[in-house]
Amino acid sequence: MQRRQYLSVAGLGVVGLAGCLGLGPDSEPAIEPTGDERVETVADGLNHPWSMTVLPDDFRFVVTERDVGRLSLVDPENGDITPLSGVPEVDAEGQGGLLDVAVHPEFPTEPWLYLTYSAANNDGETTTHIARGRLNRDDESVTDVEVLYRAQPFLDRSNHYGSRVTFGPDERLYMTVGDRQFRDFGPDHVSQDLTNDFGTVLRLEPDGSVPDANPFVDEPDVREAIYCYGLRNAQGLTVHPETDELWVSDHGERDGDELVILEAGANHGWPIAHYGCRYGTDAPVGDRPDEREDVVDPVYYWECGTGGFPPAGMTFYEGTHPDWQGDLFVGNLAGQYLGRFAVDDREVEEIEPLVADEDWRVRDVVSPPETDALFVAVDADAAPILRIEPGQESSTE
């Protein structure tokens, strides 16, 4: 039997966290953590897990490991890790590798897994890919793998792939693509150029085709898969369970990290409108988003000088505990904690850091229904999958 370790975080202070918590649009300070959550390691030994999703019919997780390009089934009840064969070859240089995973909304009737990853062409240039394959649990494999889309163009760069993917309420695929770390800020930046896929969210049908309803399908020389643009390197993407809005967490330059509600056809600002500064300076990257009418302002942000919140995977809580109902949880990489955001419509009211004393780079978080727990993937060598429960006493078994 697996030994389950429970870590008490009671009494945790906020010393050293204030810069990471920062201020939001209403300039209200972050709240202090309650420090009474219970943390359990349910699986261990993963190599830089980047994403996980829940199989709805047996409550196992599908987990990606970025650097080694491995896809596995993880059982949170006993800690068993089952690698799956048939995964596409990836390029793991820089920030690349095997990245996100999503399941078809009609799973298991439609047994498709959707994978995002970086891969190279014959010239060694890379880009963000999305592929799908059928999960065969009997053979522990992914079969009938087909590439659905390759972000264009391929480049000799290895950073800012974006790569979060989810199904929207319309049962279409939404995928983030990073700006590949182009730093020629201004109106000609790749994130403002719709002839490429960089700095965007793409919308695709489950078979990879472009929906006729996409906002730019009738415009010449524009990439038809683009749903919205003006993002830097969005590594969190989730659907609000009540409003059906798509929320994104986007990395800023120096600070300037954002929580964004996506709008079809919208310009979300990067880099012509941004709350952050250029690296190593106090010089603004662009105009303030709230001073421009041609961009969509984020619903929450960290201004230059606050320390920022380098965000990763995110989810709205859909579990059974009343205290967390409607809250948004976002992984913080550099700050090394899980951020809890209390959301009222489009207003972010408060922040609470969870598991902030363990030096865990929180890469992804999921909230399965019919349980009070969150599950978190930590980005590290020999990394754990964690179960986090609210408001309970610590224990060991």
Predicted regions and their residues:
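N-terminal secretory signal peptides and thylakoid transit peptides that target proteins
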Residues: M1-A18
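A generic structural motif
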Residues: G13, V87-V90, R180, V217, ...
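Sec-dependent signal peptide cleavage junction
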Residues: L17-A30
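Acidic, Gly/Ser/Thr-rich repeat motifs that build Ca2+-stabilized beta-propeller blades
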Residues: P29-T176, E245-G252, G307-D344, P369-G391
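Beta-propeller fold detector
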Residues: E40, I81-P88, S141-R150, D212-F216, ...
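Beta-propeller domain segments
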Residues: P76, G96-L98, E106-P108, A120, ...
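Conserved blade-ending motifs and adjacent loop-strand segments that build the rim/top face
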Residues: V348-P369
